[in-house]
Amino acid sequence: MAKQDLKKGELAEERLRLYFLNLGYFVVRSIKADFKGFDITDVDLFLYSRPSPISRERTNVDVKMKQRPQALERIFWTKGLQDVLGLEKCIVATTDKRSHVGEFGAKHNVLVLDGNFMGKLDSTERYSSDRLTEEELLDMIELYSVGELGGNWKKCYEQSKSNLLLKLNFDGVNHYLDMVKRVLEECSSGFTSQATIRMLYIYTSFFLIALDYSIKDYSYKDQPDRVRLISDGIRFGEKGKAKSLEIISMSTALLKSFMAKEEHDYGAIEHEVLSQFDSILSDDIAEYLGSTKQMQKLFSLAMNFEKHGYDRQLQSPL
C-alpha cells in the first residue's frame, strides 16, 4: 500500500505517536469519547504505560497545529478532559512557542510540548517508521471488508478504541475477547485478508492492555487468588460474581411477584442461568494469565501485537 498524504494535524499526531512509541508507551490514536451513543470529543492520542508492577499511567494528549492554537484554552480543556475520564496525566502539543504557556501548564500539572519541540519533531526523520498510519489502516478496513464481523468493521474498531477510555476493566476484557473470537471465526470461514489479520493483532493488543490494567492490584495476591479473580472477571464481568448473583436473585424474585408460582420452576430457571455462567471457559485462560511470569509479560506482548498490526510488511500467523 502506498503511503497516504496526511493533513498537518494528522501528520503531527502520527509523528507524536511514533515519538511516544519509541519512549516505550502503548499508543492509540484518534479515540472517540462518547456517552450513550453521542460523540462528545476526540482524544488525539491515548498513552498507556506500566511504570511498576502495581502502577499504571493513562494519558490523554491534545494536538493542535493551528496558526492560532489558543494554547492556554487547550490546557484548560485537556486538563478537564483528563479529570472527566479519570486518567492520570495529560499533555498538550501546540505550535505556540511562548514560554508562559509551558509555565501555565506546569502550574496545573499539564505537560506542554511547545512549538520549539514540535518544530524539531517535524524537521527530523528520526522517528520515521515502516508503519501504516491510522488513516491507511481505516481505509484498509473499509477496502477489505469481508463478511459481517458483527456489522460494520470500522464501527466495531472505533468502539473498541473508545473502550480503552471508557471500559478499561473486565467488561472491556470480555469485549476484546469477543472481537478476537469474531475475527478468528471470520478467518476460519475463509475470509482471510490483511484487514482481518491486522484486526486480530490489534484487538489482541487491546485485550492485553485491558487485562493488564484490570489486574494491576492483583500482583500482591497469591496465585490461586489471582486465578480466581481473573476467572470471575471473565465469567461475570466487572461487577463480579457477588453482584451477578444478586442480580439473578432479584430477577427471580421479580418473576415470582408477577407470575404464578405453580406455572414455573424458579429454582430451575436460576440454576440454568448459573449453569450458563459456569459454562464459560474462563478457568484455563485465568490459570495461564494468572501466573506472575505471564502477568509481567502482558504489556510487552501488547506492544508487540500492536507493532505487528501496523507493520507495512504484514506477517501472517496463519
Regions found by a protein language model. Give the residues of each.
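Domain-level recognition of nuclease-like catalytic cores that cleave nucleotide substrates
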Residues: 95-153
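Acidic-basic catalytic patches of nuclease active cores, encompassing PD-(D/E)XK
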Residues: 1-35
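Extended alpha-helical coiled-coil/bundle linker/stalk regions that scaffold oligomerization
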Residues: 194-274
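Charge-dense, extended regions
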Residues: 249-318
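Conserved catalytic cores of phosphodiester-cleaving nucleases, focusing on short active-site segments
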Residues: 20, 45-47, 57-65, 78
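Catalytic cores of nucleic-acid endonucleases
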Residues: 63-116
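Charge-patterned, long linear interaction tracts outside catalytic cores
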Residues: 149-225
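A short, glycine/Asx- and small/polar-enriched loop/turn
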Residues: 39-43
